[in-house]
Structures are given as C-alpha cells and as structure tokens.
Amino acid sequence: VLRPGDIMLSVTGVPYDTIHSVIGIDKSSKGHGSLADFGVKFEYIELTENDEIDYDAIEKRVGRGDIKMVYIQRSRGYSLRHSISIDEIEKIATLTHSVSPDTVVMTDNCYGEFTEKKEPCDVGVDLAAGSLIKNPGGAIAPCGGYIVGRHDLVEDCAYRMTTPGLGREVGATLGTTRSLYMGL
C-alpha cells in the first residue's frame, strides 16, 4: 500500500517495539526491507497528557494533504495507556476521511478482535491487520495473521506478501488450518 515517498502517520504515539523494525524506527533493521528502506517516511502524534487521542493534532497534520496512511495501534502494547475503543477508531477514521478522503486509515487490530460488537472496518477503517494466534486463534493456532478491508488494498497487500499476479490465491498454511478453525 505504501510506496517510496509516502508518509505513514501513527496517531496513537510510537507503536510497540515489535513493529519498530517493520517501520524502520529500529536502526538495526536498516537494509533488511523495512518501510524506511523503501523510502516510506514515518511520523507520529503523541497521545495527550491524559492518554487521549489528540484529534486536533490529527486534523491539523492530515489536513496538509500529504499523509498516505493513518495508522492506529488499537492495543496498548507494552504501555500503560488504555486500548483504543471502536468509538475512538470511528472518530479517527471519520475525521481523517473528512479532511483527506484519499488517506488510507489502517488499524493494527492485535488483541482487539471480538472485544466489541463492531470491528474497525465496520466503522470506516480502510484496512485492518492482526494475529491469528491471539484472540481469533484462541491461543490454539500456532501461527498466522490476517488482513481485511477494502478489496483493492487487500489485493495490494497480498501481492506484496506473495508475488504479483498470484496474490492471495497462494500462501502457506503449514497444516494449521484445523488448529486455526478450532481457535475460532
């Protein structure tokens, strides 16, 4: 989804440590295929001093029109803040799309699945991803992840994960389908 020169903006502060190397925040990942290695820029907006979403800062930054993706980390990760609620996610998505309709809103939904009646894509998020090991896999599934959302964006992700032309038509299951369904 992100290409060289694009800007990814985290609106829930700096993401948890395990994703630093994916983004390229962790300088030890330099040269290993991070987003930064491919010329994607990363910015973030801190939460307020009360650990709330800074909607004014989001509107101001996204309103400049150069943000390709707004990133929401739903889980608190290793911090002491609260998890981001579906209502907060909806407000971020609505605000983002009102000031910049083409900006992609993406939610890292790890640990957020099945915790509320709606999921991020039900409230305006364009793309969501998470682990099949945690909530959906019931700690039974030994591996796996998912990507859901707008068809064109899911297709782009599938082509990046596998190979252009094949996309989501192929992929490893490692004989784990039974465990995955047991977890669900």
Model feature map: region roles:
Residues 1-184:
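Conserved PLP-enzyme active-site core in the AAT-like
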